[in-house]
Regions:
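Auxiliary Fe-S-binding modules of radical SAM enzymes
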Residues: 1-93, 242-250, 258-351
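Short linear Ser/Thr-Pro motifs
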Residues: 76, 109-110, 191, 213
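Generic beta-strand structural signal
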Residues: 81, 93, 104-108, 116, ...
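P-loop NTP-binding catalytic core
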Residues: 89-98, 102-103
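Canonical Radical SAM [4Fe-4S] cluster-binding loop centered on the CxxxCxxC motif
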Residues: 99-136
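Ferredoxin-type iron-sulfur electron-transfer modules in oxidoreductases and energy-metabolism complexes
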Residues: 135, 139-147
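Conserved AdoMet/S-adenosylmethionine-binding subsite of the radical SAM
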Residues: 145-152, 157-321
Length: 351
C-alpha cells in the first residue's frame, strides 16, 4: 500500500463519482468503481477492466484500493479468530471473527482505544489513541479471509461507535446500500454506552439494530463503573428509546455484564424490569472476564440463571451470552492493542 496515494476503499457512491469527474472520467465510472470495490473486492485499480486502460492509469497515479491485510491472527480452541489490522495512522486495531454453526459474526472496532473508560473494559485502560477512518473500519471486513461466510456484523470491538459517528454511519451506509454490500440493516448491530446528541442522531439516521451497554439499572452505581452515565443517564437513554419503534425491523437490546455481588441481586432485577417497562427489547447477560487491577468478580452461574429467569418471567426476553475466544483475549471487554503497539515500536516494526 502506497502511503502517498488516496484509498478508494471507504468512499460512498457520490464520493466515487466526484473522484471520477475530478480526474476527467465520466460520472458513471464512479458506479463502476463501487461495483469493483464492494462487489468484486479487487486488490488493484488495474483489475477494473471495464474502465479504459488510460483512465485506470490516470486513477492509479493518485489513488489505490487501500485494503490492508491483517498482520497477526490468534486462533481460539472454540473456532474464534482474533485479527490484528494496521490503520491509516500507523496504529493497530483488533477484529474478532466468531463462527457459530450456520452463523458467522464479525466484531469490528471503530477506534484505537476508547474515551469512555468503563471500569471493567480493557480497551478503556488503553486510553484513546484516535478514531478509525471509514476505510479503517471497512477494511476489517474487506480484508477478512472469511468475508464470504459473514452473516452478521456487530460494532462491539474497540471504541465507542457514537464517538466516531460520522465514520460509523458512512460504513453502515456502504454496507446496506445497493451500490455497496447490499446487506439488510437487520444483519448489523451497533452498540453504545449512550452519548448525548449522538445516540439520537444514530437512531434518526440508521435502521441498524441497537445495543445499549446498561450493566446496572441504578444510575449512581452505573456512574461509578461507567463515567458516560454522567453525560447521558440510563434513564434518559430509555426515555429517548421510547420515542422509536422497535417492534418491526429494528431490534433493541441491552448488554448487561454480571458482576458478583454488585449488579446481580434481586433488587437489580426488579429495577431493570421497571426501567425497561414499555420497551420492546431483549437483555443479554454477559459473563465478566477478569482484567488486571480491577476489583470486580464474575457472577456465578446460578445467580445468572436466577436473574435471567426473573426477567423472563416478568416479560423481558433475556439470554445468557456464550463467551467466545476467552483463551485468546477476544471475549467481551478484553480487546486491547496497547501492548502490541508497544512491542512493535520497540522492535522497529511500527509503520
Amino acid at each position: 500500500m502506497d502511503n502517498h496515494k488516496i484509498p478508494l476503499l471507504g468512499h460512498t457512491l457520490d464520493e466515487l463519482k466526484a473522484i471520477a469527474v475530478d480526474n476527467g472520467l465520466p460520472a458513471f465510472a464512479g458506479k463502476q468503481m463501487a461495483i469493483w470495490l464492494y462487489d468484486k473486492h479487487v486488490d488493484t485499480i488495474e483489475e477494473m477492466t471495464n474502465i479504459s486502460k488510460t483512465n485506470r492509469e490516470k486513477l492509479a497515479q493518485r489513488y489505490e484500493i487501500g485494503a490492508a491485510k491483517f498482520i497477526d491472527a490468534q486462533y481460539s480452541k472454540d473456532g474464534t479468530i482474533k485479527y490484528l489490522f494496521p490503520t491509516e495512522s500507523g496504529k493497530f486495531v483488533e477484529t474478532v471473527y466468531i463462527p457459530d454453526r450456520d452463523r458467522a459474526t464479525l466484531c469490528v472496532s471503530c477506534q484505537v482505544g476508547c474515551k469512555m473508560n468503563c471500569l471493567f473494559c480493557q480497551t478503556g485502560k488503553q486510553g484513546f489513541e484516535g478514531n478509525l477512518t471509514a476505510k479503517d473500519i471497512l477494511n476489517q471486513i474487506y480484508a477478512l479471509p472469511e468475508r464470504q461466510k459473514l452473516t452478521n456484523i456487530v460494532f462491539m470491538g474497540q471504541g465507542e461507535p457514537m464517538d466516531n459517528l460520522d465514520n460509523v454511519l458512512k460504513v453502515t451506509q456502504i454496507l446496506t446500500a445497493d451500490y455497496g454490500y447490499a446487506w439488510s440493516p437487520k444483519r448489523i448491530t451497533v452498540s453504545s454506552v449512550g452519548v448525548k446528541g449522538k445516540l439520537k442522531r444514530f437512531l434518526d439516521e440508521s435502521d441498524c439494530h441497537v445495543a445499549i451497554s446498561m450493566h446496572t439499572p441504578i444510575p449512581e452505581q452505573r456512574a461509578s463503573i461507567m463515567p458516560a452515565e454522567k453525560g447521558l443517564s440510563i434513564e434518559e437513554i430509555v426515555e429517548l428509546l421510547k420515542q422509536y419503534d422497535f417492534t418491526h425491523q429494528r431490534r433493541l437490546s441491552f448488554e448487561y455484564i454480571m458482576f458478583g455481588g454488585l449488579n446481580d441481586t434481586p433488587l437489580h432485577a426488579r429495577q431493570l424490569v421497571k426501567l425497561v417497562e414499555g420497551l420492546d427489547c431483549m437483555v443479554n447477560l454477559i459473563r465478566f472476564h477478569q482484567i488486571p487491577n480491577v476489583n470486580l468478580n464474575n457472577s456465578d452461574e446460578k445467580r445468572m440463571e436466577t436473574f435471567r429467569d426473573y426477567l423472563t418471567n416478568h416479560g423481558v426476553f433475556t439470554t445468557i451470552r456464550t463467551s467466545r475466544g476467552q483463551d485468546i483475549f477476544a471475549a467481551c471487554g478484553l480487546l486491547s492493542t496497547a501492548k502490541k503497539i508497544a512491542g512493535r515500536e520497540n522492535s522497529g516494526e511500527h509503520q
